[in-house]
């Protein structure tokens, strides 16, 4: 085991930390040495799960051998994919400094959007999203159907399914399908490690049931960090409940308590209001973080957490994006009420190095607008300040809390809230279970069944154009009646814009098929249109050779049924700049109200 510990030491030393020899690391390594095909790994936030799994693959690279063709690290969101990509790059650099190897390694990321070179999960190490992994694996990508290439990538790879709890939705849809996806990944030769801080017993049971017929070495008992043996090196967190609206007390909370401070709200609109309140009251060094800020700006703000020099008076106002991927020692946390597993993750942001205090607003109305009412009601019944504080470091306590909430009865009630979900779930399950039998049948035969392979909602890619370019596009549309307009701009400039100025707009299940989104609508000659940027291979004329040309697409409506079959739709919708907000001196507040009302 010393060889693995050497890798871990190199990684943590590079990050300015000292080595902690957690027992559960060796439990994981032993399970891999025993050639387990499926492993569940449960440990608290900040307990080194990533280093434990990286040590396995990086040790092989340093030694110049391969047990797996590659490593796929799978995460729920694009921002986490970028963060993990950078983290793995740093870990690899640390190994090169200490061991002089490996010399040549390809590390890539693939989040399903428009990337100049389509990697299809290529690379020695690839970070990717769950959606991208699965739609690539099953042969449904918006730009191609390279089915055998993606299946070949899965065979013999180490597949890390990280932050699984974030896939949970209001109808328990993704957790119901994921067990069958895991079964297929194992069936095609993958070694799967499921990593999470909170593992509901009912999900574990469903995964084990889905893989019971596979001839594979499945480790049925999760590898769990034992708090009596392994002590997480972090401060204690004192939890306090209060009955007021967090917006009403935000200013007083940050002024009266130690910093750095983190405030988490359940919606973008409320987070933006809090940010403005704190700025207006001159509360100090305030930053805003949520999912509807363009990618380049958001990445710059997230770099705060990677810098060695910490901003002691920092106040972060955020949404659910702060539940994972933030390694910062916040002394004070204030959050709105949310489901128990979400609360445990939020509390894990506090007291990473020293003791901290966490305040939880118990106003249920700010939670039930976002989360299933039955889950919030059950969470409130189980909440206890002392037990919640212990859940951050004690997996047994966090498991007890989670399992008290997510019972079969609660999940049944969650599904009842979404009309027609059982039929959709049945169709998707049938496709996943019968995938092997239908491997060489055209993917177009399964578009309806595969439209919701992981989520019921829809992700709309959007882009904010600079003012001059936006006016240029509007003029182009006003001068031409066509719904497909060649855009005379260098394709590399468009690709750069997509990388820096994009964001994703989430439309949850239950939205009507034809919707209106003022935030991405534009008035052209008195009519409303949606505008998309499409990049495709075209010929300028019959006599000319082909080239890649950007095109503006005009649409009078958005049909969610059509988009849901786009399987990773890559053509971004242009944002109406009137709906993208800024604070003083051009500070990005983001696409706060895409629906033209409370969002």
Where are these regions (language model features)?
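Conserved pre-motif I regulatory segment
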Residues: 2-40
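Walker A/P-loop
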Residues: 36-56
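Conserved Walker A/P-loop ATP-binding site and its immediately adjacent core
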Residues: 68-91, 199-203, 268
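Inter-Walker segment of RecA-like/P-loop motor cores
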Residues: 96-139
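Conserved helicase motor
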Residues: 107-117, 268-269, 286-300, 319-323
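SF2 helicase catalytic motif II
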Residues: 133, 145-187
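Interdomain hinge/linker at the junction between the two RecA-like core domains of SF2 helicases
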Residues: 201-254
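C-terminal helicase lobe and adjacent C-terminal extensions/tails of nucleic-acid helicase motors
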Residues: 273, 290-296, 302, 338-339, ...
């Amino acid at each position: 085991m010393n060889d693995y510990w050497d890798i871990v030491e190199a990684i943590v030393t590079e990050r300015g930390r000292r080595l902690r020899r957690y027992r559960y690391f060796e439990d994981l390594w032993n399970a891999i040495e025993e050639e387990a095909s499926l492993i569940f790994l449960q440990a608290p936030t900040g307990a080194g799960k990533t280093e434990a799994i990286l040590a396995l693959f990086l040790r092989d690279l340093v030694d110049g051998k391969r047990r797996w063709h590659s490593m796929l690290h799978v995460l729920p969101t694009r921002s986490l994919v970028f963060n993990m990509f950078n983290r793995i790059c740093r870990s690899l650099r640390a190994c090169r400094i200490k061991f002089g190897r490996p010399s040549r390694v390809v590390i890539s990321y693939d989040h399903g959007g428009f990337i100049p070179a389509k990697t299809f999960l290529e690379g020695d190490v690839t970070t990717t999203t769950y959606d991208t992994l699965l739609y690539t694996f099953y042969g449904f990508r918006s730009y191609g159907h390279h089915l055998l290439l993606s299946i070949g990538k899965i065979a013999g790879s180490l597949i890390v399914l990280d932050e699984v709890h974030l896939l949970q939705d209001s109808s328990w849809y993704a957790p119901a399908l994921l067990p069958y996806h895991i079964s297929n990944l194992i069936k095609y030769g993958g070694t799967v490690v499921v990593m999470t801080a909170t593992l509901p017993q009912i999900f574990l049971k469903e995964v084990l049931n889905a893989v019971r017929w596979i001839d594979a070495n499945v480790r049925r008992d999760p590898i769990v960090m034992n708090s009596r043996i392994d002590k997480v090196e972090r401060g204690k967190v004192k939890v306090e409940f209060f009955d007021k609206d967090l917006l009403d007390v935000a200013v007083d909370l940050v002024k009266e308590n130690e910093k750095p401070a983190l405030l988490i709200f359940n919606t973008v609109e409320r987070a933006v209001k809090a940010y403005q309140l704190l700025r207006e009251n001159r509360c100090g060094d305030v930053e805003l973080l949520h999912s509807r800020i363009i990618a380049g700006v958001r990445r710059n703000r997230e770099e705060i957490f990677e810098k060695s020099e910490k901003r002691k008076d920092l106040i972060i106002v955020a949404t659910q994006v702060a539940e994972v991927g933030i390694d910062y020692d916040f002394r004070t946390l204030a959050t709105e009420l949310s489901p128990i597993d979400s609360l445990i993750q939020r509390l894990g942001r506090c007291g990473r190095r020293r003791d901290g205090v966490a305040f939880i607003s118990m106003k249920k109305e700010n939670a039930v607008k976002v989360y299933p009412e039955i889950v919030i009601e059950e969470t409130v019944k189980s909440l206890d300040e002392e037990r919640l504080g212990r859940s951050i470091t004690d997996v047994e306590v966090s498991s007890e809390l989670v399992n008290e909430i997510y019972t079969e009865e609660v999940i049944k009630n969650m599904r009842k809230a979404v009309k027609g979900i059982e039929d959709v779930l049945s169709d998707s399950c049938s496709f996943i279970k019968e995938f092997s039998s239908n491997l060489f049948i055209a993917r177009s035969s399964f578009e309806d069944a595969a439209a919701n392979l992981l989520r019921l909602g829809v992700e709309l890619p959007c882009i904010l154009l600079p003012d001059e370019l936006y006016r240029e596009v509007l003029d182009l549309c006003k001068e031409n009646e066509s719904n497909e307009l060649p855009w005379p701009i260098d394709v590399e400039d468009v690709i750069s814009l997509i990388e820096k100025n994009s964001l994703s707009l989430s439309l949850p299940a239950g939205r009507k098929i034809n919707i209106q989104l003022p935030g991405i609508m534009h008035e052209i000659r008195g009519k409303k249109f949606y505008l998309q940027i499409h990049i495709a291979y075209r010929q300028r004329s019959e006599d000319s050779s082909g080239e890649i040309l950007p095109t503006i697409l005009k649409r009078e409506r958005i049909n969610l049924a059509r988009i849901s079959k786009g399987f990773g739709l890559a053509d971004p919708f242009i944002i109406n700049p009137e709906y993208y907000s800024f604070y003083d001196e051009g500070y990005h507040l983001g696409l706060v109200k895409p629906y033209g009302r409370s969002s």
